[in-house]
């Protein structure tokens, strides 16, 4: 009977210890609920992108001739081009086009070498998601034009600030060799 009593006592001690550990974890979890988020948007204003900025790729399905030049010039063979050969018109018919921006290095080779100019770089650079599979864009997602950064109020106030007007006057007064 004595070994059975010690078994009950050790079981009770283990149960109390487990409840205490669960309680400590719960207290730590509840103490973090009132904290501010760790990540914040930085910079606070959206950046003004340059004219030749290489952001998300825009794709025009109607212009594509499924030549696969974009796949050949891509250093990582990234664009996936599905097509079938139409015998009656003797041309390739594009079925599907997709790019995984989780893998893309934004080199711009596909845009530069496209013979029909169906690819172009946009000024959209905020592509972060919680799931990496959401970065795989098909032809429908690629054909959507991004929301223009120029419509943003913070960008407009920066461009209309007195400092930017002074900089514009300086740029008009100073000429370089390329301006002539």
From Swiss-Prot:
Its EC number is 7.1.1.-. It is an enzyme of class 7 (translocase). Binds 2 [4Fe-4S] clusters per subunit. Residues 55-84, 95-124 form the 4Fe-4S ferredoxin-type domain. One of its GO terms (biological process) is photosynthesis, light reaction. The keyword Thylakoid applies. [4Fe-4S] cluster 1 binds at residues 64, 67, 70, 114. It is a peripheral membrane protein. Signal peptide: none annotated. It comes from the Eukaryota. [4Fe-4S] cluster 2 binds at residues 74, 104, 107, 110. GO terms for molecular function: 4 iron, 4 sulfur cluster binding; iron ion binding; NADH dehydrogenase (ubiquinone) activity; quinone binding. Disulfide bonds: none annotated. Keywords: 4Fe-4S, Chloroplast, Iron, Iron-sulfur, Membrane, Metal-binding, NAD, NADP, Plastid, Plastoquinone, Quinone, Repeat, Thylakoid, Translocase. GO terms for cellular component: chloroplast thylakoid membrane. Belongs to the complex I 23 kDa subunit family. NDH shuttles electrons from NAD(P)H:plastoquinone, via FMN and iron-sulfur (Fe-S) centers, to quinones in the photosynthetic chain and possibly in a chloroplast respiratory chain. The immediate electron acceptor for the enzyme in this species is believed to be plastoquinone. Couples the redox reaction to proton translocation, and thus conserves the redox energy in a proton gradient. NCBIfam families: ndhI, NuoI, PRK05888.1-3. NDH is composed of at least 16 different subunits, 5 of which are encoded in the nucleus. This is NAD(P)H-quinone oxidoreductase subunit I, chloroplastic. It comes from Sorghum bicolor.
């Amino acid at each position: 009977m004595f070994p059975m009593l010690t078994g009950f006592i050790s079981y009770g001690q283990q149960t109390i210890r487990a409840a205490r550990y669960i309680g400590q974890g719960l207290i730590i979890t509840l103490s973090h609920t009132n904290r501010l988020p760790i990540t914040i948007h930085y910079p606070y204003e959206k950046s003004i992108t340059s004219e030749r900025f290489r952001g998300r790729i825009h794709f025009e399905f109607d212009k594509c001739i499924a030549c696969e030049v974009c796949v050949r010039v891509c250093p990582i063979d990234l664009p996936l081009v599905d097509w079938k050969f139409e015998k009656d018109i003797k041309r390739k018919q594009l079925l599907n086009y997709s790019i995984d921006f989780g893998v893309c290095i934004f080199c711009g080779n596909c845009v530069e070498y496209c013979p029909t100019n169906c690819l172009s770089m946009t000024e959209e650079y905020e592509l972060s998601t919680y799931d990496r599979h959401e970065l795989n864009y098909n032809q429908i997602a690629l054909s959507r034009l991004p929301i223009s950064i120029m419509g943003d109020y913070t960008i407009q106030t920066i461009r209309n600030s007195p400092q930017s007007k002074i900089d514009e006057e300086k740029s008009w007064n100073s000429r370089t060799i390329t301006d002539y």
